Amino acid sequence: MEKLVTQQVQNVDPKQSEILNISEIPAENPTETPIISKQKLLEAGVYFGHKASQWHPKMAQFLLKKKRNETHIIDVLKTQKMLEIAYKLVEKFAQKGAKFIFVGTKKQAKKVIEEQAVRTNSIYVSGRWLGGTLTNNRTILSRLKTMENLEKQAAENFQGYTKKEKLAKQKQLAKLQKNLNGIKGLKDVPLFSLIMLVADPLKDAIAVKEARKKGIKIIGITDSNVDPSLVDFGIPANDDSTKSITLIFTVLADAIASAKGGKKLFAYQSDENIILPEDPEKELKQTRYRSNSFEKFARQKNTLKDSQVLKPNTEIQA
C-alpha cells in the first residue's frame, strides 16, 4: 500500500492547503513514470506565458527569471509537479464521492471540456455561463424542469399543438438545450459535493466568483497573467492553447476515471500514446508573439536541456 506522508507545497496558501487536504497526498516516487513527460508538456506549449507587462506578481515563483522578447516563460518542471498534485487531489476527491463541474467557455477549451465531462459523467459549462447557476440555484432548476417538459413533448412531436406553437416550442427547447444541456445533472448534485475544474479563471470570473460564494473548491489553470489566489489550487500553464488545455483537462479527467476504475488516456502514459490536437491557425497567430522567441532560443541551443531552459523544481518537500 502506498505510504502517505505529510508534504508541504511551498507556493500554496496555508488556508488553501488545509481546504484541499494537501498534507494527505501520496509521497512522490522518483522512479515512477512522470504524469506527463517534460517533452510532451513542451510540445503542448504549456510554457508560453504572456507579455511581461501583463503578468501577475503572484505567479513569479512559477516563471523562469529570463524573459524572451519581454515574454514570460512558465517553468515546465513546476507545471509537471503541480499537475501531478492536481491529479492526485482530483482522484482523491472522486474516490470520496465528489462530483465535478468542468468550466471552459473560451473557444480553445470548449471541445475538451465537453468531451472529458461527458466521459466522466460530470457537469459542464462550455457555452455562456448563466449568472446564478450556482448562487441562484432555484431559478436554474426551474429552467431545467421546463427543458425536461419540453423534451417530453418533443418526443411526442408536440402532439396537440398547432404548427406555429410547435415551431415556438422547438425554438425554446433549442435555446434551453444550448445553455443547459451540460448542467442537467446539477439538479441531482448537492453543491457542497461539487469541485470546479476551470480552464481560465479570468475568462470565467463569474463562475469562479459564484463557486467561491458557495464554498465550492476550485482547481484551475493559472497562466502568467492570472492571480493564483483566485483558485484553491492552480496549475501554472498556458491557458490560450488548445493543446495545453486539452492535455491538462484530459489528465484531470483521467484522475476521475481512475478513481472509478476507468481507463487513463494521458496520465502516466508514454508519449507516443498521447495525441494532441492541432492548434487552429488563428490561435497560432495569436500566440506567435509568445512562442517565436523561445523556439528561436531552443534552436540556437539545439536542445531543451533542463539546465539551459528550466530551473530545478523545489515545489514539494517531504
From Swiss-Prot:
Q: Signal peptide position in this chain?
A: none
- Keywords, A to Z? Ribonucleoprotein, Ribosomal protein
Q: State a single Pfam family of this protein.
A: Ribosomal_S2
Question: Gene encoding this chain?
Answer: rpsB
Q: Which SUPFAM superfamilies match?
A: Ribosomal protein S2 (SSF52313)
Question: Which is a GO BP term held by this UniProt record?
Answer: translation
The protein in question is named Small ribosomal subunit protein uS2
Name the protein family: Belongs to the universal ribosomal protein uS2 family.
Enumerate the CDD domains for this protein. Answer: RPS2
**GO cellular-component terms in the record?**
cytosolic small ribosomal subunit
A single Gene Ontology molecular function, please? structural constituent of ribosome
